[in-house]
């Protein structure tokens, strides 16, 4: 019997490559299961993993086998029932056992579905696969505080982790050649002189000279051996310098309507949408700030806790939120240095002529500063004035203004993917 002993020092994640290959192979099954899981989960249960089941028929390997049809001549072992020339009845069915759906059977075999668990990281990978912030640009920072280490040749000083082995060995070889060359030349001359002296007639030889040459040869050989293979003088280190870089910093304004017209069901849908957005940004972008704004008749910037869990409510003036967004941009986020995004969720109900004010704010001020604006209307009913005014904004900015309607919780994830799908750079 053969035994395989794994002596790798790191015993963790040995099958990571095989697992990734498996996830890639059954990607379509997993994505369907992940989408169903996202639609049925509550807003507080979005970050855990998921158990996935794949039907046995989908994981079976393709094989070649004889089908039930066709004419065949075979030689079977002897038996007591048949003799030469007897005709055998062809088996019925499709050549398979009797297992599967339907009534019970006393024949055949079957297999349960193959089930496995996705980790939290794998689950979120599939949730946000193929999504990205639209029109994300690199902005040049005025204070140049965004730097990136870049290679800038080699240096004689540095830390061991930056040692350049190839350059160090090249320097060591050059030093050895340079130091050993004169010694080898002197050694060669001494050996030739000794050989010449020893070839002389014994009467003419100079024993003292021979002794001096042998001593000189021994001294030179020791000098050759003393030349070190590598010396601290030979060491070279990769030199890194901090180079100012453009930044892809971004800020996302999350604007949620909490007015009295928003039912608890509407608010839960809005929270689930923003939670998906929050997880997406937190997972995929290191330098994205989030600004949370709740509004009814008045808008207020709040923290994450208050945004998701506060029970404050009131009337509806949407323009108060857009005005606050414009003020915050003017105070803290220069469009020259930041990529600016807005995600708004509302039921579409607004106070009298305020929808026209919202359109004017967007057309005259906000859209010139923003990379992308998304509006989600949560209602099963027909659209109202706010949607109609926003349609005019979308017509003027078709690539940077997006609108979608959500009727039920099952629409959240598909709508989210439509709004933030990766776009081909123009």
From Swiss-Prot:
Biased composition (Basic and acidic residues): 82-93
Region of interest: Disordered: 82-109
InterPro entries attached to this UniProt entry: UPF0229
Pfam family, one: DUF444
HAMAP family (alphabetical): UPF0229
Annotated family: Belongs to the UPF0229 family.
Name listed for the protein in its UniProt record: UPF0229 protein Csal_0882
Provenance organism: Chromohalobacter salexigens (strain ATCC BAA-138 / DSM 3043 / CIP 106854 / NCIMB 13768 / 1H11)
């Amino acid at each position: 019997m053969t035994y395989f002993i794994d002596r790798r020092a790191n015993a963790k994640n040995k099958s990571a490559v095989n697992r990734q290959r498996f996830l890639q192979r059954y990607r379509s099954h997993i994505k369907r299961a992940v989408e169903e899981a996202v639609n049925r989960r509550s807003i507080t249960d979005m970050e855990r993993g998921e158990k996935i089941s794949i039907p046995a028929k989908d994981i079976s390997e393709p094989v070649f086998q004889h089908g039930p049809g066709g004419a065949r001549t075979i030689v079977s072992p002897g038996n007591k029932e048949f003799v030469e020339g007897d005709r055998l009845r062809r088996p019925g069915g499709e050549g398979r056992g009797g297992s599967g759906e339907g009534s019970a059977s006393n024949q055949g075999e079957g297999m349960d579905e193959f089930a496995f668990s996705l980790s939290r990281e794998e689950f979120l990978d599939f949730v946000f696969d193929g999504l990205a912030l639209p029109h994300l640009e690199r902005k040049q920072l005025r204070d140049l505080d965004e730097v990136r280490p870049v290679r800038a040749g080699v240096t004689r000083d540095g830390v061991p982790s930056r040692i350049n082995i190839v350059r160090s060995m090249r320097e060591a070889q050059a030093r050895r050649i340079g130091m050993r060359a004169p010694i080898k030349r002197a050694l060669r001359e001494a050996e030739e002189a000794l050989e010449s002296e020893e070839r002389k007639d014994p009467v003419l030889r100079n024993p003292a000279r021979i002794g001096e040459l042998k001593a000189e040869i021994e001294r030179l050989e020791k000098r050759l051996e003393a030349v070190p293979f590598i010396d601290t003088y030979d060491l070279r280190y990769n030199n890194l310098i901090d180079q100012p870089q453009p930044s892809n910093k971004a800020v996302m304004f999350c604007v949620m309507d909490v007015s009295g017209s928003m039912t608890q069901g509407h608010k839960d849908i809005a929270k689930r949408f923003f939670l998906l957005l929050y997880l997406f940004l937190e997972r995929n972008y290191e330098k994205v700030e989030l600004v949370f704004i709740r509004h009814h008749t008045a808008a207020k910037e709040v923290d994450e806790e208050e945004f998701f869990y506060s029970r404050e409510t009131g009337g509806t003036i949407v323009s108060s939120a857009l005005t606050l967004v414009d003020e915050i941009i003017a105070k803290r986020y220069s469009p020259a240095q930041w990529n600016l995004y807005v995600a708004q969720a509302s039921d579409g109900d607004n106070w009298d002529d305020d929808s026209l004010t919202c359109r004017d704010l967007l057309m005259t001020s906000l859209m010139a500063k923003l990379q992308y604006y998304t509006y989600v209307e949560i209602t099963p009913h027909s659209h109202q004035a706010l949607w109609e005014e926003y349609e005019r904004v979308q017509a003027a900015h078709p690539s940077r203004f997006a609108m979608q309607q959500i009727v039920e919780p099952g629409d959240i994830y598909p709508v989210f993917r439509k709004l933030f799908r990766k776009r081909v750079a123009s």
